[in-house]
Amino acid sequence: NLVSDIIGSKKHMEKLISIIKKCR
């Protein structure tokens, strides 16, 4: 499903951003 893929990628990006912020 396109919508679920977009939501999933959004959560994935938020997770990556939180990891990057922890490294800084």
Swiss-Prot record:
Please list the tissues where expression of this protein has been recorded. Expressed by the skin glands.
Q: Which domain of life is it from?
A: Eukaryota
- Gene Ontology biological process terms from the UniProt entry: defense response to bacterium
One Gene Ontology cellular component? extracellular region
Q: Which keywords label this protein?
A: Amidation, Amphibian defense peptide, Antibiotic, Antimicrobial, Disulfide bond, Secreted
Mostly located where? secreted
Arginine amide: residues bearing it:
24
Q: Does the keyword Lyase apply?
A: no
Compartments in which it is found: Secreted
Indicate the impact reported for residue 23 to S: Loss of dimerization
Complex and partners: Homodimer; disulfide-linked.
Write out the function statement from the record. Antimicrobial peptide. Active against Gram-negative bacteria E.coli ATCC 25922 (MIC=1.5 uM) and P.aeruginosa ATTC 27853 (MIC=23.2 uM) and against Gram-positive bacterium S.aureus ATCC 29313 (MIC=11.6 uM). Has no hemolytic activity. Associates with and disrupts membranes in vitro.
What name does the UniProt record give this protein?
A: Homotarsinin
To which species is this protein native? Phyllomedusa tarsius
